[in-house]
Structure formats: C-alpha cells, structure tokens
C-alpha cells in the first residue's frame, strides 16, 4: 500500500512501478501508481479537510509541523539511507539534505510571521489590519534531485498557512516520498490534510487537470513547467508557483588563489553529479595566461574525481546520476557539442556500462554556433573564453534561463556591475553557484520560473492577503463630505 489518502494507506490502481538503485540495480520500492479516480479521491479528501485545518489556530498547526521536525531528527540516519540509496548520492550529501529539511521548519515559521502574519496599524477612528488566508487545496510536485528537501520547501509553508495538500513525488524517488509521508502521519496530521499519490506522467496530468485545485507548486524541469503553465492558462484564480532549471554562467575573471577558484568551480559544476538546478553549466574564462593556467588546473583536478556508490568508504565527492538513462543523456549532449565543433578538455566516461556512474566532462565551445540553450542535468561543463568583462556579461545573459550566476574576481566594482546587468535571481561573488540560503528567496527569471521564488518567499505563494478597515463601533464622522446634510428638520 503506497498511497496515503484521507489518512489511510491504500494500494494504487494504476500502472505497476518499481524503483531500483541507479548503480547496483537493487530493487528498493515497488507499488502501483494512483489512477485518475484515486487522484480525484485525494483532492476530495483535501477539500473536506480544508475548512477545519484552516480554522485551527496557527499555534496548533505549528505544533504538528514542529513534531515533524522532531521526527526528522530522530529518524535522520534512516532517511539519509533512503535518500542515498534511491538517488545514488553519497551518504554525506544525503545527510546534508535531511539537515536542510530539519532546518526548514524553524525558518518557515519565521518566514510565515515576517511575510504573511498579521499586522495592525492604528487609525484615528479604528484600525487597518492585514491578514493572510490560505488558498485551499494545493498540489505539490516534487523533483528527484532533492526528493526530501525541495518538496519540503513547499509542503511546510503551505501547511503552516492552513492549506491542504496532494503531494506527488517524482516517479524516480517514490521511496523517499513515502518515507517522509509516514513521518508526517506520525506527527499527527488530521486525515486529508496531506495526501500522497505516486505515479508518473499520467498521474501528474490527472492531478494538474483537477478543476477543484486552488493551486499548484512545482519544482522540476523547464519543459514540464511550461506544460503546466499552458495547462493552467486562462485560470487566474489558481496560484501557480514554478521553480525550474537554469543554464547558469560562472565567470572567472581574476584568480589570485588558483586552487580556491578550482574548488569553487567543482562545487558549482559537479556537486550532486551536476544535478542541482543552480549548477554551473557555462564557464566563462578570461583569455590570457592566467585563464589558461586555471583551465589546466581545473581539468587536472576534475579528472581525478571518481564517482562512487552511495555507501563507498571513503566517501566520494559525487555519486551516481538518478538513472543510467540520465547518464546516457549527458554523454549524448557531450557528443553533440563535439559534433558542433567543440574541443573536449576532459571527456566524460561511464565508469560501468548500464549504471549511472559518470565522470565529469569539460568541453570548450568558444566560437561555436548553434549550441543548444538547454539545461543538461549532469556533470558536463561548457567553456567559453572572453576578452573583456562586458563581453563576459553579454555571454552570461545569452540564455533564456535566469536562475543563478557567479563571479570569481577581486574587483568589487565588477560585482556591482554584474548585479546591475545580470539576468538571474541568484548572483554570487566568490561563492559557489550552488550555495543558497533558506533565509533568502530562491528563484529566477526567464525560463527559470514565473516570479514565485521559494525558500524565504515561499510563504508569499502559500497565502493571499486580506486587508480590513475596522472599528468596534459605528459613528457619524465629525466632518461630512460636501453635499451631505444630516441636520434634523422640524416636522411641518
């Protein structure tokens, strides 16, 4: 029984599905997708649970969410193993994901009060009050790269605001989704407040097409995000928050500490086997001897990175991609760029055929035309050389995406220029592109989102504002508007 609907674990009636470890092919999870009728049932359960959940005092909702945080801490080791085995990422990285999930609770509570709490301004004859109300029933679509942390970033603030939810994990990480929901169950969520439907494209389409949804919160690829945007077009009454990918540039302008710059680049491009939406995809390196030396050192160190199993000891820097098919897609993208005229600096290599273990690849594309403006979700770094900083910014902005951008430089003035001219929601200076803070908004422009940033700003799309002018008693104004006469006339 792999679906959780209205507080009950039930068996899906859709397509049979199984999840294997992307390196060892060990079977980890088996179950059936939710069919359209079960998706509708989950929505009905969420709708029925909404009025009571929304009327709960915030402190009551907060108590359940904080109990979930306690359970995450108590089961951190177990959840770390589940995430590592299912995604293929090393244990150390899976552990940091669970830690981020735990930390998200307190941050979301603070964000609720800061962004969407109640504010009152005293007036001469009463008060002006700002309150926030939950939307109602929201669908949450989770990704596979952070199957615990990223859905958590939607679910926690949405529940705190008083919404009820239907959660569909990625079909590539059903085990993590189920494991997390079981902790929510133990936290004491009332029946129907949070529902789990497993499945792939058909389940997702059934969920996103429900008329009774009040909104949809999505993290995933740009192609799916655009599809959802088209599907919900003409429905302005529904909130749609899209957190999509990027074709992110990292500018290497001035290197005073060669190894520090190489380390920052490795963290930006290859952490999580290149499967972070903020990963550097395009490396822009200044022409000249210093840039040549930097690239040589980068290729040297990156060439020593050996991806390993999730349970290898010593632990590797990177693990496997989410699937062997994902690794094959990266290889095909590299070959395509070679065919366009790219010069391979470091060839990606499958560690073992049929698995998702893939070494990093670096290819120079200076002067190459018709390079696809796409997010290749894996350890493939494209290099361009530039002559001057204005050209670097032009190259950085030469994308339909706009998620993250970074600069390695000793010149603060160059960073200030980048802040003014970059088209990206995250712009870092001498910090990895993959470094983000939950105390700041997270999102991008262009094809990277629809101006609904998450993290600290997630509270904004989980509630709508209600403004009130209030007075405990009704009185006639001392000064009336022109033309109004309230004088009492003698009866004739």
Swiss-Prot record:
GO molecular function, one term: succinylglutamate-semialdehyde dehydrogenase activity
Alphabetized PROSITE patterns for the sequence: ALDEHYDE_DEHYDR_CYS (PS00070), ALDEHYDE_DEHYDR_GLU (PS00687)
EC number: 1.2.1.71
Annotated binding of NAD(+), by residue: 220-225
GO biological-process terms attached to the record: arginine catabolic process to glutamate; arginine catabolic process to succinate
Keyword set, alphabetical order: Arginine metabolism, NAD, Oxidoreductase
SUPFAM superfamilies (alphabetical): ALDH-like (SSF53720)
Pathway where this protein functions: Amino-acid degradation; L-arginine degradation via AST pathway; L-glutamate and succinate from L-arginine: step 4/5
Active site: 243, 277
Signal peptide stretch: none
Keyword match Zinc: no
Catalytic activity, as annotated: N-succinyl-L-glutamate 5-semialdehyde + NAD(+) + H2O = N-succinyl-L-glutamate + NADH + 2 H(+)
Family: Belongs to the aldehyde dehydrogenase family. AstD subfamily.
NCBIfam families: arg_catab_astD, PRK09457.1
HAMAP family in the cross-refs: Aldedh_AstD
Role according to the record: Catalyzes the NAD-dependent reduction of succinylglutamate semialdehyde into succinylglutamate.
Protein's UniProt name: N-succinylglutamate 5-semialdehyde dehydrogenase
Lineage: Bacteria, Pseudomonadati, Pseudomonadota, Gammaproteobacteria, Enterobacterales
Recorded name of the encoding gene: astD
């Amino acid at each position: 029984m792999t679906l959780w609907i209205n507080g009950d674990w039930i068996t899906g009636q859709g397509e049979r599905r199984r999840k294997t470890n992307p390196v060892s092919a060990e079977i980890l999870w088996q179950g059936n997708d939710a069919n359209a009728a079960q998706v509708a049932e989950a929505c009905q359960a969420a709708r029925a649970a909404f009025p009571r959940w929304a009327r709960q005092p915030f402190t009551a909702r907060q108590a359940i969410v904080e109990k979930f945080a306690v359970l995450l801490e108590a089961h951190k080791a177990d959840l770390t193993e589940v995430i590592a085995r299912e995604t293929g990422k090393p244990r150390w990285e899976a552990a940091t994901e669970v830690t981020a999930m735990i930390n998200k609770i307190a941050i979301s509570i603070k964000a609720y009060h800061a962004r969407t709490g109640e504010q009152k301004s005293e007036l001469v004859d009463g008060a002006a009050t700002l309150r926030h109300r939950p939307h109602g029933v929201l669908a949450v679509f989770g990704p596979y790269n952070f199957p615990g942390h990223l859905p958590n970033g939607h679910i926690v603030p949405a529940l705190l605001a008083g919404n009820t939810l239907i959660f569909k994990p990625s079909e590539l990480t059903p085990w993590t989704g189920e494991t997390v929901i079981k902790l929510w169950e133990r936290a004491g969520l009332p029946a129907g407040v949070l529902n789990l439907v497993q499945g792939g494209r058909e389940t997702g389409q059934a969920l996103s097409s429900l008329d009774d949804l009040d909104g949809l919160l999505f993290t995933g690829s740009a192609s799916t995000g655009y599809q959802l945007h088209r599907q919900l077009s003409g429905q302005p009454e529904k909130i749609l928050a899209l957190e999509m990918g990027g074709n992110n540039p990292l500018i290497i302008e001035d290197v005073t500490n060669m190894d520090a710059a190489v380390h920052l680049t490795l963290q930006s491009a290859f952490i999580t086997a290149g499967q972070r939406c903020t990963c550097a995809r395009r490396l822009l390196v200044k022409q000249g001897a210093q840039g040549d030396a930097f690239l040589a050192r980068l290729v040297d160190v990156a060439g020593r990175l050996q991806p390993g199993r999730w349970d290898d000891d010593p632990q590797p820097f990177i693990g496997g991609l989410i699937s062997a098919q994902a690794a094959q897609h990266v290889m095909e993208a590299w070959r395509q760029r070679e065919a366009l005229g790219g010069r391979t600096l470091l060839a990606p290599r499958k560690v073992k055929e049929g698995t998702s273990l893939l070494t990093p690849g670096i290819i120079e594309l200076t002067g190459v035309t018709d390079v696809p403006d796409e997010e290749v979700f894996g350890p493939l770094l494209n290099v361009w050389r530039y002559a001057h900083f204005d050209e670097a910014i032009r190259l950085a902005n030469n994308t339909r995406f706009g998620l993250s951008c970074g600069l390695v430089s000793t010149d603060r003035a160059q960073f200030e220029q980048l802040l003014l001219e970059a088209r990206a929601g995250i712009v870092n200076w001498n910090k990895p592109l993959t470094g983000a803070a939950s105390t700041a908004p997270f999102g991008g422009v262009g094809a990277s989102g629809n101006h609904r940033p998450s993290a600290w700003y997630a509270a904004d799309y989980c509630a709508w504002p209600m403004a009130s002018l209030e007075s405990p008693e009704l009185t006639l104004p001392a000064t009336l508007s022109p033309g109004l006469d309230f004088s009492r006339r003698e009866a004739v």
